[in-house]
Amino acid sequence: IVSKKIKSSFPSETKVILTTTAGELCTFDLNTKKDSLYHEANNPWQNIVLQSFSEDIIDKIEILTIPLFSENITSQTISHQERINKIKNEILRLNIPFKINHTDCFALTIVDGLSNSESFLTEAVYESGRLPCLLIGGSSGGKLDFQESYIFNNEQATRHKAVIMLIKMKKNMKYGVFKSQSCEKTDLSFLIAQSNMLNRSVQSVLNSKGNRIVNFVDAFCHHLNCSLADLKTVLADYTFAIEVDNELYIRSVSNIDIENKSISFFCDISFGDLLYLVKNKEFVSQTNIDFKNFSARKKSKPIGGILNDCILRRLLNAKNLNSLKTFEDIPLAGFSTFGELLGLNINQTLTALFFYEVENEEDFYDEYVDNFVHKYAKFSTYFTQREIHKYQLIAKVRTAVINSLKDAFPLIKDMVEILNYIYEDTTQTNKLIVEMTKKFEKFSNDIVSNV
């Protein structure tokens, strides 16, 4: 009802996209500067923040709605590739009415924040090859009971879908891509051996020293020298991340199941992923440093921006939110998300678009946009690389098992000879032992020849 009323307030040709949030971010109320970037969201709130863009900034826009097939996702039985293919087929059917060039076009994306499908979407996008541009945005938010989350796609409120705004900029407009995380990588990492991508839980990892599969919680407690009872307290100062092209993509913990010894995440973790432990840092100074570095080679200030800010940044830094003044002179808006997108799914991160008016496009530089072809290739091959890691892990475990069998062969042969000696007077038993010995020797030779 609310979304329909908002839509009806604008001319029919105006495209309106709305999302539920876990809190809103905004620097200006029309022409009045606000005291805090973060709107209050501790108690039930009914804020509506609207951000509009004129035809002087945006040349063309196409709204694409993609089904995610995520209804009852944790109980579904279709294979991973079947799920990717279903989403990819929906993408291949899309009508894209203009040519996509990554220098002036991007895909601002909002994914159903309760669908557990952000990575499935991105993998399908790269497999389809239909959107060769920046994929940036976030997952729709909502109350922290995680019961409802909606996206309005200019026509209706939707669930279990992703809404992509394919936006082409005017010739005198440029966009820059900003990313900020308040963490640093430690020396500790885990190679995932057993996980569930649908409920986003991890059960076991590979012990690098002995090529043994061990419980993730046990391994983590061992490395940090803490008890099960203290694990949640110790983890309060840490989170996890994968690494793509030397950049961290955070995977935040959603729950620690002490009884069943498993850890759940707000992003899916795959068998074969290399998961790094990262330590949290103070977020105000880090955001300031990141934005200073981002702005260093830009000759003008941005005329506006869109922020996708993880709900965990709001929750973990609640006492310092009002101290963040980095963007106070820039007209921008955004929301606290249930996850972010920047090429791949990510947590505990601020991803943002800033817009610039330029006279000569050759004078504008953005590290992300100028190196986009390289980054796109890394995002696209991430999923293939993950498959390679799976096979490498299987090969490691298989080799370890074979080596263990090889070590046991002499002992087993000795045992057979002892049995033969004990029962040498029993004709029938003797025949069985001879037959077993021949089979074992053949098995042994086959194994050794294949190692």
Where are these regions (language model features)?
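Hydrophobic alpha/beta core scaffold segments
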Residues: 1-451
